Amino acid sequence: MNANGTIRTLLLALSFTTAAAFAQKNPLDEISSHDGLAKVNVKGIDLAYKSADVDIARYGKLIVDPVEVAFRKDWNPTRPGSNLKLSAADRENIRTGVAKVVQEEFEKALKAGGGWQVVNEAGPDVLRLKPKILNLYVNAPDTRQAGVRTFTLTSGEMTLLLEAFDSESGAIVARVIDRQESRNTGQWQLSSSVSNVGDTREIAARWARILRDRLDKAKGAGKK
């Protein structure tokens, strides 16, 4: 299966994968096995796969590709207080806003404390990260309409598909998939662009911390 075919199949599988299914055998296991990846356990991540033939410790630099974002197929909201569908411009603003927040949190975590050097060119010691946000679902998009207030239990949910490749050969090194829903306090909260962005940033920062921790551990293991 070529790379494009794998991604298309992954997207299809993810669109039908529920939270409960993440804990059981699912099509993603077979797809990743097809790519020569073995399933591994990563605390805080639903699914993780790694190539047994590649030592991540060999990499000292990273390329972080621009974050891609796709909405969940059944997400078709109306403007708050109206029966009008959300405009294409509003949808694009949400998509680019989420991409920007995730990109910022990943690069901030990776660079923190002089950790990993993020570069733009491929090299023998460069690992390419390709982050994608899939199945983005925003419960109450804020279109800043006067006199309209919306309350929700959660801001929404999104799924991370992060793949790591050797920057020169293009060989896949690792793949992780994780679905996250924003915090649910059990109380109705006023929804706004500020709260939506804040919840997105919280989830992205969590993913970024786990990524940084795993990369640091791999690098440390390679020095022993």
Label the predicted regions.
Residues M1-L11:
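Bacterial N-terminal signal peptides that target proteins for export
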Residues T9-A19:
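Bacterial N-terminal signal peptides
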Residues Q24-K50, E157, E168-R175, S182-K224:
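C-terminal/domain-edge helix-coil "capping" segments
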Residues Q24-P66, A70-K73, K108, A112:
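N-terminal secretory signal peptides
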Residues A48, K61-A70, V126-L134, L161-E163, ...:
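Soluble periplasmic/extracytoplasmic beta-strand elements of cell-envelope proteins
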Residues Y59-R128:
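N-terminal segment of the mature soluble domain
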Residues R95, A99, Q103-E107, I133, ...:
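Extracytoplasmic/secreted envelope proteins and their assembly/folding machinery
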Residues K108, A112-A171, S182-S191:
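Surface-exposed short loop/turn segments
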